[in-house]
């Protein structure tokens, strides 16, 4: 099965323990857009901020919410994490002298962009809450919620490791940080065999990174004294 389909099956088997319904509907792109639009229009008004005040149109706000919500999942981050980073950057930037006019303009651009991101973070978090309230999940939710299930349900890891004595991972260069975190939570220090080609990584647009290959040993082996076999296939037989 694909990484997402495997994660989805684990999520649905344990959905009730996470506060979700096992039959949670998978959002289509069009349904996700409509839900994000509803959040921007309704919750945006509650924030008391006009879109044009943060240099956003309705479409760019919706696109930004969807993109940011997915990125929060893909990086196992929260809106609070992003807000903390922005606050620290603002503190550091504010401490830089602005004697020169060009630098002052750069400061202004940064703070305008930071304010826009802060607004989008609030909207993205509300979008995530709305998905839960309405019984929806999307593709990134499948893996994020499965990873959460592994962390929160003690028996799940042991059950899966007993079921899968040996784990084979294909196209490993196309795994994302989220997928890798999920697989590590389940199978670190378990017999895992992965195949990947850094020259064929094609899913960078959704968070995949060929650097996962370089970090494979550190990801799945915590026992530094135990050797990990690595083989290089220099000839393609396709």
Language model: regions and residue ranges:
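Conserved P-loop NTPase-based nucleic-acid remodeling module centered on helicase motor cores
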Residues: 1-67, 211-215, 219
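Residues at helix-coil transition
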Residues: 12, 41, 132, 151-152, ...
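Conserved RecA-like helicase ATPase core segment
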Residues: 177-238
């Amino acid at each position: 099965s694909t990484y997402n389909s495997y994660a989805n099956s684990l999520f649905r088997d344990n959905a009730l323990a996470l506060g979700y319904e096992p039959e949670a509907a998978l959002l289509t792109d069009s349904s996700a857009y409509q839900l994000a639009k509803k959040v921007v229009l309704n919750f945006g008004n509650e924030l008391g901020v006009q879109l044009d005040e943060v240099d956003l149109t309705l479409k760019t706000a919706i696109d930004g919410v969807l993109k940011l919500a997915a990125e929060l999942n893909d990086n196992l981050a929260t809106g609070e994490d992003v807000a903390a980073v922005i606050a620290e950057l603002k503190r550091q930037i504010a401490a830089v002298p602005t004697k020169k006019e060009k630098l002052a303009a750069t400061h202004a651009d940064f703070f305008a962009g930071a304010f826009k991101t802060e607004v989008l973070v609030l909207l993205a978090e509300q979008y995530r809450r709305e998905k839960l309230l309405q019984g929806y999940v999307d593709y990134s939710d499948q893996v994020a919620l499965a990873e959460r299930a592994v962390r929160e349900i003690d028996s799940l890891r042991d059950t899966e490791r007993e079921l899968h004595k040996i784990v084979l991972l294909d196209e490993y260069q196309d795994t994302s940080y989220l997928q890798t975190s999920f697989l590590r939570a389940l199978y670190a220090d378990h017999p895992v065999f992965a195949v990947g080609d850094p020259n064929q990584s094609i899913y960078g647009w959704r968070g995949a990174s060929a650097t996962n290959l370089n970090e494979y040993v550190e990801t799945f082996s915590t026992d530094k004294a135990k050797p990990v076999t690595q083989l290089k296939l220099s000839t393609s037989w396709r």
